[in-house]
Regions:
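Cyclophilin-like peptidyl-prolyl cis-trans isomerases
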Residues: 1-170
């Protein structure tokens, strides 16, 4: 990714993470994430799903575990050549390939089974749009937080991991 690529700072309750967007290969996903950052949408949201050795997911629930209303779903860009490698961010979605909105996840390891393999229901994969360039130690610390069930959700941190503020770095 180029040195002029947009960077976003996520100030969390466990420390700071800086990510660099790849607007060249993932223009829709990067623009979508940036829109939510600029609107302040992620401020006060939590990382609600932590699976050590796999990924940590956030961007959709507030500290009361209420799901936030989102904008329109976006087209899946997982066929962009970017891979779900350790430290990359990808758009979370439902089983429907083109259902991503605000939620994203950070890969703890190379998760090649999440990569694009074909334009069919099982092959679309998950669109990578950014990578952690600072604070991977913070992401790794999230994996050490005890988790449990909350409502119908599993792997939820017992203590909220909050995105206190998301800022575009100029």
């Amino acid at each position: 990714m180029s040195a002029t690529a947009t960077q976003v700072k996520l100030t969390t309750s466990l420390g700071t993470i800086v990510v660099q967007l790849n607007s060249e290969k993932a223009p829709l996903s990067a623009a979508n994430f940036l829109k939510y950052v600029k609107e302040g949408f992620y401020n006060g949201t939590i990382f609600h799903r932590v699976i050590p050795g796999f990924m940590v997911q956030g961007g959709g629930f507030d500290t009361n575990f209420e799901q936030k209303a989102t904008g329109a779903e976006i087209q899946n860009e997982a066929d962009n050549g970017l891979k779900n490698k350790r430290g990359t961010l990808a758009m979370a979605r439902t089983n429907a390939p083109h259902s991503a909105s605000s939620q994203f996840f950070i890969n703890y390891k190379d998760n090649s089974f999440l990569d694009f393999s074909g334009k069919n229901a099982s092959g679309w994969g998950y669109a990578v749009f950014a990578e952690v360039i600072e604070g991977m130690d913070v992401v790794d610390a999230m994996a050490k937080v005890p988790t449990g069930n909350r409502g119908h959700h599993g792997d939820v941190p017992k203590t909220n991991i909050v995105i206190e503020k998301a800022d575009v770095l100029e």
